[in-house]
A protein has these predicted regions:
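Acidic, polar low-complexity linker/tail segments
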Residues: 1-15, 20-30, 44, 104-114
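Short, charged loop segments at secondary-structure junctions
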Residues: 24, 63-95, 126, 143, ...
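An active-site-proximal "capping" alpha-helix that borders the catalytic cofactor pocket
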Residues: 32-45
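VWA/integrin I-like adhesion module and closely mimicked acidic/polar interface patches used
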Residues: 125-168
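Von Willebrand factor A/integrin I-like adhesion domains
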Residues: 153, 157-214, 221
């Protein structure tokens, strides 16, 4: 039995890929955990997103873990993450894209319509699993050019290489979000608000305008 609510409504799926490597220790991991908490709280307070937004959280340090398997926002329980290890970001991207494809198949199996899924990536550094870079980058390019996902990469703090992140965006020319390590929690508020906007939109629309970014987040083009 698939973990899907509100079969008659159009759904939006979102995978959060979050960095829990050693450099995220201290304030950054606390900010991340608080961000994941307010993200769920905001979705659950919206009567539409409550049953139509589906969420998955994948963490990556030395290992990649699916800490929250896909579930309706109504059932989302924020994880409490700890920092340590390297930065297996490329493996996380591949895992996230696999999770999206599996969720889309579940939607199709039960006849649920869906908006283009979202992949949100947050990191404070650069990947250490470079042997998987080509695979991860190509998978993203195929998905983006095939209009199969929306991708939101975000670098936090001075150690994040936004130019490296840019290579993962559509044709290497998409936007990268940027914020300080001490103040990126609002990205999760923006993400949940934008998902709520999409979930409330006319299902026949092909494009929806998202919420404006908060002042604490900049865009690098």
């Amino acid at each position: 039995m698939y973990n899907i609510m509100n079969f008659g409504e159009k759904h939006i799926a979102c995978v959060l890929l979050v960095d829990v490597s050693g450099s995220m220790s201290g304030d950054a991991i606390r900010e991340l955990n608080e961000g994941l908490r307010v993200f769920g709280e905001a979705l659950q307070s919206d009567s539409k997103a409550y049953g139509c937004a589906d969420v998955c959280v994948v963490s990556f340090g030395s290992a990649v873990q699916q800490v929250v398997p896909f579930c309706p926002a109504a059932e989302y329980v924020p994880p409490v993450l700890t920092a340590g290890g390297l930065t297996a970001m490329n493996e996380a991207i591949i895992t996230g894209l696999d999770m999206i494809e599996m969720r889309k198949q579940e939607y199709k199996d039960v006849g649920v319509d869906y908006w283009r899924p979202w992949v949100f990536l947050l990191t404070d550094g650069v990947p250490t699993d470079n042997e998987l870079y080509q695979d991860a980058q190509q998978r993203l390019q195929d998905a983006l050019n095939g209009k199969k996902i929306n991708f939101f990469p975000m670098g936090i703090g001075g150690g994040a290489d936004t130019q490296a992140l840019k290579k993962y965006t559509k044709n290497g020319s998409g936007m990268v979000l940027k914020a300080s390590k001490e103040n990126f929690q609002e990205a999760f508020v923006w993400l949940s608000s934008s998902m709520s906007v999409v979930s409330r939109s006319d299902p026949s629309m092909s494009k929806v305008d998202l919420e404006p970014l908060p002042n604490t987040i900049t865009v690098e083009l």
